[in-house]
Amino acid sequence: LEKKANEKLAVAKAAYERGDYEEAKSQIDSIKILYPKAFEARKAGQALMLDVETKAQQKTLAYLDSAFQAKTGEFNAIKDKFILEKDAEYQQVGNYLHPAQTVEKNMHRSFLRFQVDELGNMSMTSIYCGAGNIHHVGVKVVAPDGSFAETPASKDSYETTDMNEKIEKADYKLGADGNVIGFINLNKDKNIRVEYLGDRAYKTTMSPTDRQAAAAVYELAQILSAMQQIKKEQEEANLKIEFINKKKERKAQEEVADK
């Protein structure tokens, strides 16, 4: 019994040494299932399993490190095309905007503004400026072929008055925007009509600059959110390694105590 279990263990060790960690795990698991009474082989298998899991996590980390470097390279290549708005005193996380869409350049204009924070969370703001309120809480974007996308009612909207001008703003997060951001990105080279959805009808056309801003910020958001996802996976892999090391220490202490 032990002999057959040890043969399996040898196959597992060989797989481990050539870096085939899935095969090694599967061989160790089979010892437990096929030879439950081969205690020595099972014990050796458990010890090997900890080594296998450590190496597997290290391999994952190496892959994640190179993926993070690649994404960082993509980010560095385009970050200077954007303006980072961040008040160091009040904000831990700043927002990237397309230079053409800063507040100073767009006074008294009704348009869709796009931004992404440093953690990759993108949002769109529909801004309305006019002589009278329309009380809008959503927008619909329409392509020349009649296809369209429409936001749900914004959960974050407000209205104000400045020197007799009515200003309304409504925010929509990517993923809760009725795919309006994705639709604009897809149709960035086409003429897009914007219909503000409120008590009164209001329509405008997206300028080519606004369409390009949407696409550029969308691309940046994909890169930044991918970087955040990689960081999260790196943390998970490091935690797993920490957990395995603690398990190894415990086993070593138990063996000393047994002696």
Predicted regions and their residues:
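Generic helix N-cap/helix-start motif at coil->alpha-helix transitions
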Residues: 2-8
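Hydrophobic/aromatic side-chain positions at a characteristic register within alpha-helices
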Residues: 9-17
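Short, charge-rich amphipathic alpha-helical segments embedded
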Residues: 25-57
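Alpha-helical linker/edge segments of TPR/alpha-solenoid repeat scaffolds
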Residues: 48-79, 87-90
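Contiguous beta-strand segments within globular domains
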Residues: 106-134
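Extended, solvent-exposed segments with strong compositional bias
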Residues: 146-174
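Internal interaction segment
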Residues: 164-171, 189-259
